[in-house]
Amino acid sequence: DLVIGIEVPSVEKTNELMKQCDRVLATGGAAMVEAAYSSGTPALGVGVGNAVITVDETADLDDAADKILMSKTLDLAASCSSDNAVIRVDAIHDEMLAKLQQRGGLVLDADQKAKLQQAIWVDGAINAKVVAQTPAFIADYAGFDIPEGTRFFIVPETGTGPDHPF
C-alpha cells in the first residue's frame, strides 16, 4: 500500500507502522520526526512548509511534473503542504528535470542560488518579504534576472544539514 490510514491513531500504532513500512515521511513536531528516525526504517523528517516529494523510475513522470508544478504555483506555494523539495532517483534524474523545465521550472546556477539563499534566509529565519511571491518578484529582490515565463525555481542542492538550506 502507498498510504495506510489508522482509524484510531495512537503513538504505539504509529511507531509500529513506521517499523513495518519501506520508508517514512514524517511531518509534525520534533518528537514525531525523531521517532521516525529511530524506527529503523529509512526516514525523511520535515518541518512546517517543507514537504519532500520523491520521484522514482516507477512514476508517471508527466503526471509527477504536472503535480509538482501545481503544488509550486497554487497560491504561490504558500501552503505548508506545497512541495518544497524533490528527490529524483538517478534512473530518471535527467528526464524528470527536463519535464520540470518544460513546465516553466528554471534551474538556478551557483550565483543565483547564493543570491536566492541570502534573500530567503535572514538571520536563520525565513524572510517574510519573499513568502508567497512570484518568481519574478523573488528574483528581482534577490538581485538576479530570470527569463519571462519562469513559473518556479529548481535549486540543485549538493548536501544536507544547516549549511545546505535548500
How would you label these PLM feature ranges?
Residues 33-162:
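ALDH superfamily catalytic-core signature
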